[in-house]
UniProtKB/Swiss-Prot annotation:
This is Large ribosomal subunit protein uL30. GO terms for biological process: translation. CDD domains: Ribosomal_L30. Keywords: Ribonucleoprotein, Ribosomal protein. GO terms for cellular component: cytosolic large ribosomal subunit. InterPro entries: Ribo_uL30_ferredoxin-like_sf, Ribosomal_uL30_bac-type, Ribosomal_uL30_CS, Ribosomal_uL30_ferredoxin-like. It comes from Vibrio cholerae serotype O1 (strain ATCC 39315 / El Tor Inaba N16961). GO terms for molecular function: structural constituent of ribosome. Belongs to the universal ribosomal protein uL30 family.
Length: 58
């Protein structure tokens, strides 16, 4: 399966609780924290939910 790198680019302070939970689900904690995840529909859906706070590299 292909992998993607997801980097948090903005703070989660003041965001919707669901969006904070989505970031935690992706494994992101701090600004500029990067995680490598499998490219699955579930992960893509989570990224789409918080697209304004993350950067994705394929």
């Amino acid at each position: 399966m292909a992998t993607i790198k997801v980097t948090q680019t903005k703070s989660s302070i003041g965001r919707l609780p669901k969006h904070k939970a989505t970031l935690r689900g992706l494994g992101l904690r701090k600004i500029n924290h990067t995680v490598e995840l499998e490219d699955t529909p579930c992960v893509r859906g989570m990224i789409n939910k918080v697209y304004y706070m993350v950067k994705v590299e394929e």
